[in-house]
C-alpha cells in the first residue's frame, strides 16, 4: 500500500467487562521510528477524530466479545481512501499518552470498570494535540504535505505540543542531559 507515515492512523479503545466501549480516541501518525527494531512505532502524532474508523473498530471489538484495551494500526490507501486495518494489539499502545494529553486518560475507564465496578459513559479523546518524541525541526523536515506542516506549526505555536520526556519541573541535570542526548540520537537515526 503506497503512502508515507502520515497515511497511518492509531486507534486506542477500552472495552469494559460489560462489553461496552468506554474509551475511544485516535491520531494521525506523522512520523514513525525508522530503526530496524522500532519500525511501526510512531514518534509523532496529531490527535484527530475519525468517526468512521471509530465505528468500525468498536464493531470489530464488540461483535467478537472483546474485553480490555485495544490498539489498532490502520492505513488509509491514498488510491481510493479505503481504511485498511492492519492489526489490533491486545494492549494499550506504547504511545498511549496521546490519549491523556487529548483529554481522555485511559486509566479512568479501566479503574471505574475493574476496581470501582461501575459502568461509565464513553470517554472520547477529542482535543487536538501534537504528541511527539522528536525535535520539532526534525519532525517538520519529514512532513511533505504543506497543509499538514502548517497545521503542526499552528499546534506548536498554540502550545498544544506534548512530549512526555520534557517536563519543566524536572531539575536533575543528569536526567535533562539524558533527554537531550536522546533527542540528538533521533537526529542521528533519521540521518542514516
Which functions belong to the PLM regions below?
Residues 34-42, 46-74:
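Oxyanion-binding "anion nests"
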Residues 47, 51, 100-105:
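Short, conserved loop/turn and helix-capping segments at secondary-structure boundaries
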Residues 108, 112-192:
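Peripheral (often C-terminal) accessory segments that flank ATP-dependent C-N-forming ligase machineries
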Amino acid at each position: 500500500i503506497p503512502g508515507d507515515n502520515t497515511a497511518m492512523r492509531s486507534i486506542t479503545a477500552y472495552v469494559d467487562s460489560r462489553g461496552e466501549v468506554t474509551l475511544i480516541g485516535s491520531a494521525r501518525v506523522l512520523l514513525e521510528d525508522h530503526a530496524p527494531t522500532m519500525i511501526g512505532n510512531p514518534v509523532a502524532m496529531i490527535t484527530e477524530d475519525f468517526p468512521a474508523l471509530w465505528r468500525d473498530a468498536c464493531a470489530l471489538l464488540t461483535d467478537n466479545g472483546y474485553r480490555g484495551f485495544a490498539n489498532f494500526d490502520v492505513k488509509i490507501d491514498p488510491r481510493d481512501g479505503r481504511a485498511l486495518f492492519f492489526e489490533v494489539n491486545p494492549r494499550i499502545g506504547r504511545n498511549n499518552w496521546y490519549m491523556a494529553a487529548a483529554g481522555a486518560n485511559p486509566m479512568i475507564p479501566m479503574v471505574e470498570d475493574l476496581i470501582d465496578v461501575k459502568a461509565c459513559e464513553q470517554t472520547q479523546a477529542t482535543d487536538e494535540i501534537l504528541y511527539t518524541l522528536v525535535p520539532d525541526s526534525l519532525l517538520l523536515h519529514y512532513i511533505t504535505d504543506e497543509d499538514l506542516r502548517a497545521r503542526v506549526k499552528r499546534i506548536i505555536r498554540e502550545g498544544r505540543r506534548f512530549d512526555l520526556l520534557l517536563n519543566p519541573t524536572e531539575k536533575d541535570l543528569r536526567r535533562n542531559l539524558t533527554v537531550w542526548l536522546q533527542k540528538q540520537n533521533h537526529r542521528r537515526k533519521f540521518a542514516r
